[in-house]
């Protein structure tokens, strides 16, 4: 335990308990706080209590086909993920990875390109040449247009050349393409005899967000995805669900009785979920003009985190049990009328400002953005959950571009103590307890509570106990795609989004967007780049006597 300075936190004194004045106490201990941290020089003393994944059957040999393999996603995320799975000996005993794209390449030229890009995008450096060579022998390239039936016939012949067993029958199709092309690809692989609802082996389809742009388009997309496949064969990826700290939400809640018994309206005052980005839209202006922060972040990432934070305990860890509870939670969110949305939702857009001492342009000055655009780069909302556990507890969500820092954090703010003893002396200045789950960066969990400041006076101030992933387990943290690809091969759907989850989330988002149609942004909805959002966002919480808590950079 060590003393550190804690900027922005005020010293609190419990009045006249030991005949010391507040000013005396301030003079004695201003600027001093205590944070309990992990001593990284001490080795782990506690062995693992158990490994649930140890009961999983060995992964079956399979072939993975990446459609749109010449795009950034393959080089930046997919191939590095497969490489690290090989390095960690997590891949099946036999596998093949086929890249399908229009560009004219050979197996060898594609392998060489990927090797060069791995130098930039691998999370571990340097790249292990022995691991790469063993991995690269399983990389193949199939040139073809997504609409050309002959190209799929060529793909089928390539798969058949691997043998008649699992490498031909167990197939994972990764659609790294535009959503508008999903239907075409699925129909073509079905016609080529590669995709079946029932039959030998297994076939699965992996798709990336966006899963539509509203409820109607999402329903249409879901019909296309399940035209030739069962719902359990479809893996909808939200990379947030692959993050270690997001997965740890369920572990934190349901393997620790000390916290779960506080996780309800009796103890919790409100919950804040912040996903802030320090960067602007950059060269994604064209995409952002169609999406905006609500569709880009709230519909998927933020509602997924909310569902994990607030869901009821599942009856088991089986995929459908977990996903059932997430859907129940989303359906429990109180529907927003246009009048409700006007009170409970705030949008914003950044104008020119300064970040790290450097000037940055406003959203309307970004490339491919309309000069009079009303698209939101920031959104904050208050959601209410109508169930026994959370009735009356507001959940505040906010996300935005060009904010002061990039961070994702969930803060559980507990109710204040009764107005006696220390609370009676300090009044509203006595800090309330909180648990914060830091999803990124500096992943970890900290508990905020009040403690006595050392000294002759009875000084009270907030202190933190901090659990850091890096300090406790070392710097090894797999990328989200590594875990998600492994789960797709294994056929475990827990970390993938089910059809009804997608559609329920779109119902929430659509009800908000209806209230914005045709309405221009007001002055209180603009914010300078490098600040924490528009004034209207503070007004949203002030209605209930709450304030935003900015994520704190704890190392």
Where are these regions (language model features)?
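Secretory/organelle targeting and membrane-embedding segments
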Residues: 34-207, 211-555
């Amino acid at each position: 335990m060590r003393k550190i300075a804690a900027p922005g936190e005020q010293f609190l004194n419990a009045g006249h308990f030991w005949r010391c004045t507040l000013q005396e106490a301030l003079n004695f201990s201003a600027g001093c706080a205590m944070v309990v941290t992990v001593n990284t020089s001490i080795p782990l003393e506690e062995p693992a209590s158990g490994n649930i994944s140890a009961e999983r059957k060995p992964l079956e040999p399979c072939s993975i086909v990446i459609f749109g393999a010449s795009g950034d996603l393959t080089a930046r995320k997919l191939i590095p993920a497969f490489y690290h799975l090989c390095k960690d000996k997590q891949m099946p005993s036999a596998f093949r990875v086929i890249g399908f794209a229009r560009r004219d390449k050979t197996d060898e030229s594609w392998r060489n390109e990927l090797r060069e890009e791995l130098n930039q995008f691998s999370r571990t450096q340097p790249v292990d040449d022995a691991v790469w060579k063993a991995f690269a022998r399983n990389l193949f390239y199939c040139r073809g247009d997504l609409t050309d039936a002959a190209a799929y016939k060529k793909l089928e012949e390539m798969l058949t050349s691997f043998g008649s067993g699992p490498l031909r029958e167990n197939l994972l199709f990764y659609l790294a393409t535009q959503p508008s092309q999903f239907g075409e690809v699925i129909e073509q692989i079905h016609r080529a005899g590669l995709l079946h609802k029932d039959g030998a082996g297994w076939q699965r389809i992996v798709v990336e967000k966006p899963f539509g742009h509203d409820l109607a388009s999402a329903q249409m997309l879901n019909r296309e995805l399940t035209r030739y496949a069962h719902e359990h064969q479809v893996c909808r990826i939200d990379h947030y669900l692959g993050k270690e700290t997001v997965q740890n939400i369920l572990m934190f809640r349901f393997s620790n009785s000390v916290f779960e018994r506080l996780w309800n309206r009796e103890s919790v005052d409100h919950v804040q979920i912040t996903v802030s980005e320090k960067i602007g839209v950059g060269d994604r202006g064209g995409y952002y003009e169609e999406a905006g922060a609500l569709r880009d972040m709230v519909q998927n990432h933020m509602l997924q985190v909310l569902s994990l934070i607030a869901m009821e305990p599942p009856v088991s860890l089986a995929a459908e049990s977990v996903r059932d509870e997430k859907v129940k939670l989303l359906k429990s969110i109180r529907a927003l009328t246009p009048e409700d949305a006007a009170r409970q939702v705030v949008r914003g857009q950044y104008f020119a400002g300064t970040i790290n001492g450097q000037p940055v342009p406003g959203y309307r000055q970004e490339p491919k953005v309309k000069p009079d655009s009303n698209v939101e780069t920031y959104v904050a909302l208050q959601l209410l959950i109508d169930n026994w556990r959370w009735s009356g507890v507001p959940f505040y969500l906010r996300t935005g571009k060009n904010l002061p820092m990039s961070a994702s954090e969930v803060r559980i703010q507990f109710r204040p103590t009764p107005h006696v003893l220390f609370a009676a002396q300090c009044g509203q200045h006595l800090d309330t307890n909180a648990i914060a789950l830091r999803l990124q960066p500096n992943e970890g969990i900290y508990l905020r509570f009040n403690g006595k400041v050392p000294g002759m006076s009875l000084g009270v101030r907030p202190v933190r106990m901090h659990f850091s992933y890096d300090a406790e387990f070392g710097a090894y943290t797999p990328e989200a795609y590594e875990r998600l690809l492994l789960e797709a091969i294994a056929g475990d759907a827990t970390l993938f989004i089910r059809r009804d989850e997608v559609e329920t989330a779109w119902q929430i988002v659509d009800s908000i967007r209806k209230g914005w149609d045709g309405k221009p942004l007001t002055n209180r909805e603009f914010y300078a780049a490098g600040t924490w959002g528009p004034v209207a966002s503070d007004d949203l919480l002030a209605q209930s006597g709450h304030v935003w808590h900015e994520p704190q950079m704890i190392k």
